């Protein structure tokens, strides 16, 4: 590690930091509308730097106005850069004034760039025996590094001495100019030699030396071991003029004529009154207070009155980072020494981004192809371990790479950020590595910030938060049947793609995390529910569930016969044969030949045959009823009875569903492959499918299900005395509701009245209208309205809750669960009545459904912790709606069921008791 000597000359690349701060910070303004974000970023960096190193001599160097000698050498130099934004230009003059008021010398020299001024001062100081610390984010400055000249990037806290330059760029400081001349520099529009990238440039320079040597001994190039070595000499010769032009453009001048010497760059005492006026004008309130208290700076060359004080960007502005993604500092690691050096960096990083690359999306069967890491914006590494295409270079073996990385990956204190880390955790588990230190998941950060703002995949988030279009997998792998798997992709493309994944993930975290920290409720959900749930879901997925394919096969054969019967019945009703699965043919039969009046139309103008429409038509016509039954059975057959046996993993003999935390608006989990949530709950067909979910030998299935959880949450949220009393006394809530609504003694309530009350109870949770209730109960609308009016008379707290929630939603634009999860409702003030009504229904339902989701997630976390600590023989194998399903050894059933029951009922406190019903059996149906 580089040791910074005492009292170095500090040279700050002001222009570099000005642009980086502009892109890193949000567009902050003061109350007068004047931009302040870039100023804030630069000043924050300067203050931290001066307070940390306490120099007696320093300078902040900016580019001067006008052209430089490089523009005369090459007319396209930096020509691709857009003009300086007006809101950045407006900050330059006040920033200069603040820098000077801080007591720091400020330099800008016409005809050259800030780099040249810094290079000249650095060499002068070195000759005088003074150590130099250059604060910059530009890679071309690496050419200035010597044992006495060090670079520091204060935005990422990265320090580069000679050894670190080699580790980062693959060449020593004295070859950095040659390195840039060969590969070019897209940020400055330095052309370089066409076809020479980072790896080729490194191979040339490491093999033979600098540009002069390459052109003096071209015959030796063909003997180097890199792709394209045999033709490289000719390519260099063809582009010799461009190479040497690039060399000139990349060379930092160290002989600029300056009016000041290093010894004259003394740090002065801050001009407190001037600083105070500027800070007040631009409303840097925290710093205003610091200046007034005499504790703005503490440097040896000045006399501030107080001890240094730590500051954080988060004190006044979101701690965000650059939105410009550059591939210049991505490396592909092919040797152990470089990997060990990177591991050392990762171990010191406060947090790092991490990603895996594989040959399949199925994390149970997938093989690890490589890993990528990022420790600072723009700096990332890819470690390939299994690329096996023709002529692929030698790589560190998968076993050796994981052996070296395992301590870091399993270190709880090494905080990791990823995008959908549940997948990466599963991949590593295939190789016996338990991923720990899972601190941040950008998919979940986005989801918790706003579940309905858009998609939460990395590509979408990069466009939304970073304004960056990522490299897509299709771009490097192709499409369709000829698509390559990741192990077949050339390292040059694979390395950039994989490193970008880690880099973008880190930058997304740095953008979103400050926003999340501002909101107590969402932050609580993220830290205490969603992130702890990641390893729990990963374990459930890996546990999988045992399926009996014979049960499903028999069921499928029965469904085939029943579908044939329904098809025959439909043909008889229609008076002709037609394809029941054809929407077009069904439209013709129903609305043309049978003369049924269409209820709705599709966006294309055709009469709708949706499930909702058919349900309404089925009240009056026989054919829609048959079609509905046919569709339901056909879906069960294709989705479950036929498909589930094909989903059995040959490696494990079990079915492994995938759970998704960031899909539903309200926080409910969803699942795919298979979708467990869509298995019918209350009919015989659903029971038959559940019978195929079986326990292995000597084990039984245990199911634990929250009873009427959303109604209990409604009672808690509404504080309605009638509901609270009914639940507290353990009454049948639907019978109790019927007694209240119909004014009857509890014991005289009929099953039909209970059914009506149940429809009201559950309907209100989902914001059902009188029209919807009428349709469900098949009664006149007026009668349904009467039932609802009676309900609200008997349970006035519920009506008050609904009205209060609607009002809060309109005022805030969102509603919250008990834990603070938010559901934003963009249509709550819509001029479109249907959209507004849907948003109002969602406003009423979301706090209940979302709170139920939070409760079962808390239960999963609590139960999993107990299982991991005390019950290794018990497996949690499924989560479906409000139910958790386990495999339990037959000798442990009673004790385990009792503890699960207790943990689930006590994971959250409501004003009404939570009730958990636990059952067991040889299969899921028996347990359920």
Curated annotation (Swiss-Prot):
The keyword Ion transport does not apply. One of its GO terms (biological process) is base-excision repair. Its EC number is 2.7.7.7. The keyword NADP does not apply. Residues 324-928 are annotated as: Klenow fragment. Residues 324-517 form the 3'-5' exonuclease domain. Residues 521-928 are annotated as: Polymerase. One of its GO terms (molecular function) is DNA-directed DNA polymerase activity. CDD domains: DNA_pol_A_pol_I_C, DNA_polA_I_Ecoli_like_exo, H3TH_53EXO, PIN_53EXO. It catalyses: DNA(n) + a 2'-deoxyribonucleoside 5'-triphosphate = DNA(n+1) + diphosphate. Keywords: DNA damage, DNA repair, DNA replication, DNA-binding, DNA-directed DNA polymerase, Exonuclease, Hydrolase, Nuclease, Nucleotidyltransferase, Transferase. Residues 1-323 form the 5'-3' exonuclease domain. Belongs to the DNA polymerase type-A family. NCBIfam families: pola (TIGR00593), PRK05755.1 (NF004397). In addition to polymerase activity, this DNA polymerase exhibits 3'-5' and 5'-3' exonuclease activity. It is able to utilize nicked circular duplex DNA as a template and can unwind the parental DNA strand from its template. This is DNA polymerase I.
């Amino acid at each position: 590690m580089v040791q910074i000597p005492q009292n170095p000359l500090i040279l700050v690349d002001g222009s570099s930091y000005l642009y980086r701060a502009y892109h890193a910070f949000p567009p902050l303004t003061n109350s007068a509308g004047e931009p302040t974000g870039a100023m804030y970023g630069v000043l924050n960096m300067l203050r931290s730097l001066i307070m940390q190193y306490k120099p007696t001599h320093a300078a902040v160097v900016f580019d001067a106005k006008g052209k430089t000698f490089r523009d005369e050498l090459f007319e396209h130099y930096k020509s691709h850069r857009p003009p300086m934004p007006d809101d950045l230009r407006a900050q330059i003059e006040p920033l200069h004034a603040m820098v000077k008021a801080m007591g720091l010398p400020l330099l800008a020299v016409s005809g050259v760039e800030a780099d040249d001024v810094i290079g000249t001062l650095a060499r002068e100081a070195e000759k005088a025996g003074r150590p130099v610390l250059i604060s910059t984010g530009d890679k071309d400055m690496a050419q200035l590094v010597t044992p006495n000249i060090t670079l520091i990037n204060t935005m990422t806290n990265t320090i580069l001495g000679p050894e670190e330059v080699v580790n980062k760029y693959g060449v020593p400081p004295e070859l950095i100019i040659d390195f840039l001349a060969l590969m070019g520099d897209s940020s400055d529009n330095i052309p370089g030699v066409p076809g020479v990238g980072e790896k080729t440039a490194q191979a040339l320079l490491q093999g033979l030396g600098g540009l002069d040597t390459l052109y003096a001994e071209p015959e030796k190039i063909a003997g180097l071991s890199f792709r394209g070595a045999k033709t490289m000499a000719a390519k260099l010769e063809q582009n010799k003029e461009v190479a040497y032009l690039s060399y000139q453009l990349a060379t930092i001048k160290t002989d600029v004529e300056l009016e000041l010497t290093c010894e004259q760059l003394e740090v002065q005492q801050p001009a407190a009154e001037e600083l105070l006026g500027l800070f007040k004008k631009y409303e840097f309130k925290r710093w205003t207070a610091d200046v007034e208290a005499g504790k703005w700076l503490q440097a040896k060359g000045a006399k501030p009155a107080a001890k240094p004080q730590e500051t954080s960007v988060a004190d006044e502005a979101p701690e965000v980072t650059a939105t410009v993604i550059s591939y210049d500092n991505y490396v592909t690691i092919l040797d152990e020494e470089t990997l060990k050096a990177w591991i050392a960096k990762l171990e010191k990083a406060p947090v790092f981004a991490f990603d895996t690359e594989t040959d399949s999306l199925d994390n149970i069967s997938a093989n690890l192809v490589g890993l990528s890491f990022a420790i600072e914006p723009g700096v990332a590494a890819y470690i390939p371990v299994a690329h096996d295409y023709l002529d692929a270079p030698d790589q560190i073996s998968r076993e050796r790479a994981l052996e070296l990385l395992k301590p870091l990956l399993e270190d709880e204190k090494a905080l990791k950020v990823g995008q959908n880390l549940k997948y990466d955790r599963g991949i590593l588990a295939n190789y016996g590595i338990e991923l720990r230190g899972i601190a941040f998941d950008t998919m979940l950060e986005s989801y918790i910030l706003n579940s309905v703002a858009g998609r939460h995949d990395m590509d979408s988030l990069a466009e939304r938060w970073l304004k960056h279009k990522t490299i897509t997998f299709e771009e490097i792998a192709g499409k369709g049947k000829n698509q390559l798997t990741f192990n077949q992709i050339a390292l040059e493309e694979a390395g950039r793609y994989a490193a970008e994944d880690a880099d973008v993930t880190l930058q997304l975290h740095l953008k979103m995390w400050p926003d999340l920290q501002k909101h107590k409720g969402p932050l609580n959900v993220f830290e205490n529910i969603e992130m702890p749930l990641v390893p729990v879901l990963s374990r459930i997925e890996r546990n999988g569930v045992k399926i009996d394919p014979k049960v499903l096969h028999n069921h499928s054969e029965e469904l085939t016969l029943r579908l044939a019967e329904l098809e025959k019945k439909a043909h008889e009703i229609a008076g002709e044969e037609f394809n029941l699965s054809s929407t077009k043919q069904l439209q013709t039969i129903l609305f043309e030949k049978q003369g049924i009046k269409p209820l709705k139309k599709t966006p294309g103008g055709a009469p709708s045959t949706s499930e909702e429409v058919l349900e309404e038509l089925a009240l009056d016509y026989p054919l829609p009823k048959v079609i509905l039954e046919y569709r339901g059975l056909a879906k069960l057959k294709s989705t479950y009875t036929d498909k589930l046996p094909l989903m059995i993993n040959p490696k494990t003999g079990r079915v492994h569903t995938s759970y998704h935390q960031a899909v539903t608006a309200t926080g409910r989990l969803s699942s795919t492959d298979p979708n467990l949530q869509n298995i019918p709950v209350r009919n015989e067909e659903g029971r038959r499918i559940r019978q195929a979910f079986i326990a292995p030998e000597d084990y039984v299935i245990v199911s634990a299900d929250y009873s009427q959880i959303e109604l209990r949450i409604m009672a808690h949220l509404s504080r309605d005395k009638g509901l609270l009393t009914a639940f507290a006394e353990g009454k049948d809530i639907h019978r109790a509701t019927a007694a209240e609504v119909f004014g009857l003694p509890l014991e005289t309530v009929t099953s039909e009245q209970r059914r009506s009350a149940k429809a009201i109870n559950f309907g209100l949770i989902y914001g059902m209208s009188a029209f919807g209730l009428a349709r469900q109960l098949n009664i006149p609308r007026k009668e349904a309205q009467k039932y609802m009016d009676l309900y609200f008379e008997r349970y006035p707290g519920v009506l008050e809750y609904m009205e209060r929630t609607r009002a809060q939603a309109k005022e805030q634009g969102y509603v919250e669960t008990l834990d603070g999860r938010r559901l934003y409702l963009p249509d709550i003030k819509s001029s479109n009545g249907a959209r507004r009504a849907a948003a109002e229904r969602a406003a009423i339902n979301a706090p209940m459904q979302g709170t139920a989701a939070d409760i079962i997630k808390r239960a999963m976390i609590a139960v999993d912790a107990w299982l991991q600590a005390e019950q290794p023989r018990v497996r949690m194998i499924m989560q479906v709606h409000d139910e958790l399903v386990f495999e339990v050894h037959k000798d442990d059933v009673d004790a385990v069921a009792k503890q699960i029951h207790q943990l689930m009922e006590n994971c959250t406190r409501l004003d009404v008791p939570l009730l958990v019903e636990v059952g067991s059996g040889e299969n899921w149906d028996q347990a359920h």
